Amino acid sequence: NGHEIAHHGLYHEPSYGDTVEEQLEIIDKSQEIFKRIIGKPAAGFRCTGGLCEEAEEVLYNDPNTLYTCQGESSELPVFMEVKGKKTHTVRISCRQEVDDYIQMVYNAYPPIPAGLPRISAYEDVLSNFKDEGDGTLRFGGVLSTAFHPQVSGSPGKSKILDQLLAYITSKPEIWCTSCEEVASYWQKKGGAANV
């Protein structure tokens, strides 16, 4: 209760299949699992691999797909377009600067420094997250994070999340909410021109 659920597919696969049917089958199976466990389909789709245009057309016109977090980084949400037509699905960028996987996972390539793996200093990661939040406040926009239980769930790394949440909630000017609420707001306003 209180947590937002979006899905990546069944197995965090880099590809959802070679055909429209294979791709939609994986998405449908994933949604069936959510319906069985949490009683409803996931409102968001966080694509780990590419979808063919025909699968995107079905997915982003599905009333259950409120938002996606795929595509290039941007400060404001946009409506997804497929074949030149705007869909109701809102794309909310999940920027790499605030993705725990990008910031904290063991990195063998590129080896930085050469010959050694890298795990970022926790204080640096927290500072990066805060700086992105401050910049978003200064210039405006939406900042969507990504936290993976297998990354941020360790005892030491969980402190980063605790401290970041304390920092965010200490600022009354931040609307701290779910991607589902951001997408609903964006849909009601009709996009950037009306916000």
Question: Predicted segment positions?
Answer:
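Catalytic alpha-helical scaffold of carbohydrate-active enzymes acting on polysaccharides/glycoconjugates
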Residues: 1-44, 48-91, 96-97, 123-145, ...
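Acidic/histidine-rich, metal-coordinating catalytic segments
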Residues: 148
